[in-house]
Amino acid sequence: MRSKLILLLFVVAVFLNSSFSQEQTSKELFNGINLDGWIVYGTEKWYVSDGELICESGADKQYGYLGTEEYYKNFVLNLEFKQEDNGNSGVFFRSTIDGTKISGWQVEVAPPNNHTGGIYESYGRGWLIKPNPNKDKYLKMGEWNKLTVKVYNDKVTTWLNGHEMITIEDQIIGKGEGRIALQIHDGGGIKAKWRNLTLTDLN
């Protein structure tokens, strides 16, 4: 009986420690008030309204990025996005930015039939993996969508509204270092909203 009690206490202690550790390493990337903790790249519009982070095409109609000040290696990123107008955007990870040139990997966020949830390598190999076309039905254009991105060593998995979109293991990704960044595509006429950006550090 005593041994069972000790075992039970051990299991409870491990669970509480795990929960505490996860709480300690999770944080909000967007404070809902301003762009503190982020860097704007390019001339496209990034602003906060009603607690939402909004990107919108500017007069130059070029690529634009909003990158974290910090680098993140292994993590789970949860966020919500809502596409208005064209809504062509993306979420970059382990990326570096020079002006409006970004090197790294993008989780696609795009209108229907454009591979949302897939992985694209910028200024490199291009598309590494696209979701099965049947999964495009999980995207709710014009509504709030939940995107989850897990990056751990050389493995990346994405989920859209609770549905796994892709999983890929890639040695080059595994060696990557850099920021998380949100993208607005070039061409003009684009608007997207973001909220509830939460990151759990897995290092």
What is each of the regions a protein language model found here?
Residues 1-24:
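Bacterial Sec-dependent N-terminal signal peptides
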Residues 20-203:
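Carbohydrate-interacting regions of secretory-pathway proteins
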